[in-house]
Amino acid sequence: MKFDIEEFKERRKTDFEGAWHAGPSVITPPESSKIYPRYAYRRAKVHPIFDTIARLRAAYMSMGFDEAMVPVFIDEQDVYRQFGPEAAAVLDRVYYVGGLPRPNVGISRERLDAIAEIIEKPLAEGTEEKLMKCLHAYKKGKFDGDDLTHEMSVALGVDDGVVVHILDTVFPEFKELAPESSRTTLRSHMTSGWFISLAQMWDKKPMPIRMFSVDRCFRREQEEDATHLRTYHSASCIVAGEDVTVEEGKAVAEGLLSAFGFTEFRFQPDEKRSKYYMPETQTEVYGKHPVHGWVEVATFGIYSPAALAEYGVGVPVMNLGMGVERLAMVLTQAEDVRKLSFAQLYPPVYSDTDLTKGIGLREEPQTAEGRRAVRAVMETAAAHAAERSPCSFPAWKGELYGHQVEIVVEEPEENTSLLGPAALNEVYVRKGAVLGVPDTEKFADVKAEGVPVGISFLYSTANLALARIEEAARVGEGTSIQVKMSKHPSDVNLKIEEYVMRYITDNKKKLDLRGPVFMTITSKIL
């Protein structure tokens, strides 16, 4: 809160030590949600795949490669031009692009009568002709399918919602359409697009041409599993020039992968021999990572002159490619590419620190004075916790909502203590379990290995009491709050967020906040 500058200047001159010790008085007690670990600056999470893509793009450009967008839609004939006789087998793994045909819709008198019945009025003169022109224009592709409803509503002079009903009941052929495939495919690897690109630029740019692209590819896998997706990202590059050899691939691989911590490299012939590469040039790249050891990370080769000639390209071209998901799995030590790519579709994994942020108070005082009173109640209760009862200790006196209020911590029953054995328990999260534990040797491992939530039963109960005391003070009344046995989080004023509860139950973790608290806090209006 703001403080009086002049007052502290004077106090500094006359009593420096006193002014120094008075410093904490200018701090406004925070709400429980403003106390760490619930209060923290959260960093937004970048997706590991897109993070890897960003790093790959930066690495390529730092090596002097220009970025390109490579065609996604590949005509079937291009696959034959690149793979030759092998193309028939290769096409088994690609997706063909298909779509719904546009029907030739006839308008009979029966249909016109059905439309008139739906719109509850006779069709105006010229409406039949307008409707026929509209459907004919749709058939000819003069407007898109998502505009059909609007165009028909204009022709018929009715609302779009009525047209939807007409299409559903009067023109059933729209619902009976079956998709038809074209001869266009989605690229299954970046090479398909590189050949098309090289055909247009190889003799129009200075040599050597160095370009890269990081983008999606599509492969018709029989099923997706821990290491295969039907769509994935490929980080691919080409180097085209008269003197290009396989040594180019080795140099590019080292320059690119060293940016990810790989320190040593091995190159060995790939057992798979793609027909678009020259014989003996298809090479697997293995990199040694300080954490993960030797892993396969890329493949390169020199495009076959037989394939390049189909596109009129007359210089050798080195192509290197790697799966982004594969590299990201190595870097993050992920075991399942599905969970790495589509994490939101799988149960989340939370650290103990993550879980602490979802544990807070159900009720707490709304005023700064109320929060100061919480601290006073805690100090008084802790100082006299073992005092035998009956006993009563004044904890705080001050103003709440225009009334002078006095608060005491007491235990009216005989032959017990001011606080119960669990009143000083502190809440920890350890290996996903939420536990309220005392400061004893028995629970030393919980405190050593767990993450403190920053809430004790004493703190949560004192906040509950002050919240109720404030409510009573608003109407000029005193009140008494008593907490006995804790069996559930709410018994000690604790709120566990739904995502934390779901994580605990889904993973069969423990939630144990039980214990004898036995604490009574009473207020009265002076």
Curated annotation (Swiss-Prot):
Keywords noted in UniProt: Aminoacyl-tRNA synthetase, ATP-binding, Ligase, Nucleotide-binding, Protein biosynthesis
Gene Ontology MF terms in the entry: ATP binding; phosphoserine-tRNA(Cys) ligase activity; tRNA binding
Binding site for substrate: 189-191, 234-236, 276-277, 319
Gene Ontology biological-process annotations: translation; tRNA aminoacylation
Catalytic activity field: tRNA(Cys) + O-phospho-L-serine + ATP = O-phospho-L-seryl-tRNA(Cys) + AMP + diphosphate
Superkingdom of origin: Archaea
A Pfam family of this chain: tRNA-synt_2d
Enzyme type, top EC level: ligase
Cysteine-cysteine disulfides: none
Enzyme Commission number(s): 6.1.1.27
Function summary: Catalyzes the attachment of O-phosphoserine (Sep) to tRNA(Cys).
Subunit composition and interactions: Homotetramer. Interacts with SepCysS.
Family, per entry: Belongs to the class-II aminoacyl-tRNA synthetase family. O-phosphoseryl-tRNA(Cys) synthetase subfamily.
Name this protein carries in UniProt: O-phosphoserine--tRNA(Cys) ligase
Organism, scientific name: Methanocorpusculum labreanum (strain ATCC 43576 / DSM 4855 / Z)
